[in-house]
Amino acid sequence: MIEYLKGAIVGLTPTNLVIECAGVGYDVNVSLTTYSAYQGKKEGLIWITQLIREDAHLLYGFSTKEERTLFGQLTSVSGVGPTTAQLILSSYAPQELAALITTGQADALKAVKGIGLKTAQRIIVDLKGKIQLETSSDEILSARTAVGDAALNTIASGEEAISALKMLGFADPAIRKAVKSILSEDSSLAVEDIIKRALRML
């Protein structure tokens, strides 16, 4: 099994990363969290989970071991496949997700597209005792009021963009994560520009 890949990053989208190692290019599935970590980088090391099926060999990549561990824990839950696990990790940063599971916030997990209440509750029941937080819940909640949140609260275009993206069928947590990131870089963007950029990330 592949533990990690290290080499030149030759392609990067919100869902996939192509990394060249010893002349071979590997197509790796990634979350928005990992995508953000490798933006602008020409080289990198990515931690790998390899899934072998009859019809395909799939690689899932993560910028940290912590995110990879969460991916493995999520896919161990009945009803949560790798695609759904990646969507959950795209909606919440690892520490945020760990806090939601530890504190039993099923409604927040249910907001992720494809996750129903029963599945959200199952994730909490199965993983609550396995999640180890390196920071307290208070620190995590405090972090969620940083620059991105301030931008959403003060700029009307951010809320308009969120509403429009919801109408397109995207999940609220993933939308807010994308829009916060966009506005933290440029808070003067018009609604249509925010939406266009968010669509490239969702």
Curated annotation (Swiss-Prot):
The keyword Metal-binding does not apply. Residues 153-202 are annotated as: Domain III. This is Holliday junction branch migration complex subunit RuvA. One of its GO terms (molecular function) is four-way junction helicase activity. CDD domains: UBA_RuvA_C. Coiled coil: none annotated. Residues 64-142 are annotated as: Domain II. It comes from Porphyromonas gingivalis (strain ATCC BAA-308 / W83). It is found in: Cytoplasm. Belongs to the RuvA family. GO terms for biological process: DNA recombination; DNA repair. Homotetramer. Forms an RuvA(8)-RuvB(12)-Holliday junction (HJ) complex. HJ DNA is sandwiched between 2 RuvA tetramers; dsDNA enters through RuvA and exits via RuvB. An RuvB hexamer assembles on each DNA strand where it exits the tetramer. Each RuvB hexamer is contacted by two RuvA subunits (via domain III) on 2 adjacent RuvB subunits; this complex drives branch migration. In the full resolvosome a probable DNA-RuvA(4)-RuvB(12)-RuvC(2) complex forms which resolves the HJ. The keyword Transmembrane does not apply. InterPro entries: DNA_helicase_Holl-junc_RuvA_I, Hlx-hairpin-Hlx_DNA-bd_motif, NA-bd_OB-fold, RuvA, RuvA_2-like, RuvA_C, RuvA_C_sf. GO terms for cellular component: cytoplasm; Holliday junction helicase complex; Holliday junction resolvase complex. The RuvA-RuvB-RuvC complex processes Holliday junction (HJ) DNA during genetic recombination and DNA repair, while the RuvA-RuvB complex plays an important role in the rescue of blocked DNA replication forks via replication fork reversal (RFR). RuvA specifically binds to HJ cruciform DNA, conferring on it an open structure. The RuvB hexamer acts as an ATP-dependent pump, pulling dsDNA into and through the RuvAB complex. HJ branch migration allows RuvC to scan DNA until it finds its consensus sequence, where it cleaves and resolves the cruciform DNA.
